[in-house]
Amino acid sequence: MLSQIKREGNRVVMLVNRRYTARGKNLPSSPKKVRPIADNIRGKSYIKAIAVLCSMPNKGAKLLEKVVKSAASNAMYHNKNLSEDMIFVKIVMVDDGRRRKKIWPRARGRADRLVNRNCHIFVEVDEKKDIKG
């Protein structure tokens, strides 16, 4: 988080650039399946990212779309001057979530272990800054 210190008369005011984030925890999809989708939208504008995610048939794309929309909604709620055109996807992280382990009965009294994987998705969006040089 970046901050700037500004002096107003005798008072010192600290201006903080907010981080607009959203998290999805224990979402029912394997991180291995969601990471390639996350790589497609990282660094793109919000509108392009949503367009890409809507066009994908994957379950992970739908989960990622919800988290990205939530992060953008948080940004527009906390900063009333922001619009959808001014937002881009800054950080997307997909981590391992909780694993659900089950026993799967097999022939001749044996048993196999079935592991269902979940994932945590973290998305941070930021506003586009025009660089004038």
From Swiss-Prot:
Name the Gene Ontology biological process terms. translation
The keyword Ribosomal protein is assigned to this record: yes
Q: What Gene Ontology molecular-function terms does this entry list? A: rRNA binding; structural constituent of ribosome
Q: Name one Pfam family in it.
A: Ribosomal_L22
Highest taxon, organism lineage: Bacteria
The cellular component terms of Gene Ontology attached to this UniProt record, alphabetical and capped at eight, are: cytosolic large ribosomal subunit
Keywords of the record, alphabetical order, are:
Ribonucleoprotein, Ribosomal protein, RNA-binding, rRNA-binding
Quaternary structure (record):
Part of the 50S ribosomal subunit.
- PANTHER family noted in UniProt: CHLOROPLAST 50S RIBOSOMAL PROTEIN L22-RELATED, LARGE RIBOSOMAL SUBUNIT PROTEIN UL22M
* Protein family according to the UniProt entry: Belongs to the universal ribosomal protein uL22 family.
Q: What does this protein do?
A: This protein binds specifically to 23S rRNA; its binding is stimulated by other ribosomal proteins, e.g. L4, L17, and L20. It is important during the early stages of 50S assembly. It makes multiple contacts with different domains of the 23S rRNA in the assembled 50S subunit and ribosome. The globular domain of the protein is located near the polypeptide exit tunnel on the outside of the subunit, while an extended beta-hairpin is found that lines the wall of the exit tunnel in the center of the 70S ribosome.
Q: Can you say what this protein is called?
A: Large ribosomal subunit protein uL22
- Species assigned in the record: Borrelia garinii subsp. bavariensis (strain ATCC BAA-2496 / DSM 23469 / PBi)
Classification lineage? Bacteria, Pseudomonadati, Spirochaetota, Spirochaetia, Spirochaetales
